[in-house]
Each structure stands twice: as C-alpha cells, then as structure tokens.
Swiss-Prot record:
One of its GO terms (cellular component) is cytoplasm. It holds the Pfam family Pribosyltran. Belongs to the purine/pyrimidine phosphoribosyltransferase family. It is an enzyme of class 2 (transferase). Pathway: Purine metabolism; AMP biosynthesis via salvage pathway; AMP from adenine: step 1/1. It comes from the Bacteria. Homodimer. It is found in: Cytoplasm. This is Adenine phosphoribosyltransferase. Keywords: Cytoplasm, Glycosyltransferase, Purine salvage, Transferase. InterPro entries: Ade_phspho_trans, PRibTrfase_dom, PRTase-like, UPRTase/APRTase. It catalyses: AMP + diphosphate = 5-phospho-alpha-D-ribose 1-diphosphate + adenine. It comes from Staphylococcus aureus (strain bovine RF122 / ET3-1).
Amino acid sequence: MDLKQYVSEVQDWPKPGVSFKDITTIMDNGEAYGYATNKIVEYAKDRDVDIVVGPEARGFIIGCPVAYSMGIGFAPVRKEGKLPREVIRYEYDLEYGTNVLTMHKDAIKPGQRVLITDDLLATGGTIEAAIKLVEKLGGIVVGIAFIIELKYLNGIEKIKDYDVMSLISYDE
C-alpha cells in the first residue's frame, strides 16, 4: 500500500513556509491505519520488543495500537507536569529555548527491550530525548519507528546509532 497517498499536506502551517505532513488522514482510514500499524508490529516482532514508548501526542496514537496488537505495554513520554507520579526528566534545546520531557520513574525496567514510536522524524530532538529517558531507566532501545521521515531535516543524524524504520520518506 502506498501510504503517502493518505498523507495530507497543509501549506504554511503551523507557520509560513512550512509544509505540514498531516497523518490524521491515515488514521481516519481504517485500512491505511491498520496497514501502518501492522508494518510497525512486524518490525517490532523482529526485535523481540518488551514494551513500546511514545512521546505525546502522536507517539501515543502510533504506539498504543502497536503495543495492543503485540499484547505488551505502552509507556508515555510527556511534557513536564503531565504525569501524576514520580518522574525522570530530560531537558533539551529547541531553536528558541528549551523543552522538558518526562517519564514515570517505574515505566521501564532495567533490561527491557524498547521500541520507540512517533508519527514523524524531523530534527530528531524529541526522539533523542525519549531515548535518553529510556536509557536512564535502564531500557535498551532496540528500534525506533516512524510513519514519516523528513530526510531533508537530517534528524536521523541524532539517532544514527539506533535501528530506525520509517514507512514514508520525504526528500524535500
């Protein structure tokens, strides 16, 4: 299936000059969403994954159906102040400022094999932060899966030491 045909491109959103790749048009098509989920499940099964991790919010909508399909758990990565129990945190730089992501301190057990999922790889900052959180808890990142990779932003450089798959690539 050519998933690219299900991606909507929204020009000048969220700011002028950006061509936003909207995956909600994959999700609202059951066949396309199921196909994408199943492809990531196949990838995860080959890596003997114990748990799936995804950053808010679109990492949830990719990772949860994968975890459910595999009969394993899902651990969310959230912005600071959004998780109710004790957390670990990772602060990282943005173009203009910083951001903080957190995970529950008991979300990952040492030695667990982790798949990290998100909708899109752009600059790689969010996924790099998720990796740092998983590894701080003793997890082993055995794979990272995206629906879309924006190759022209070169985010893969931040995660080049990991096994990465994306279902759709944009070169420009």
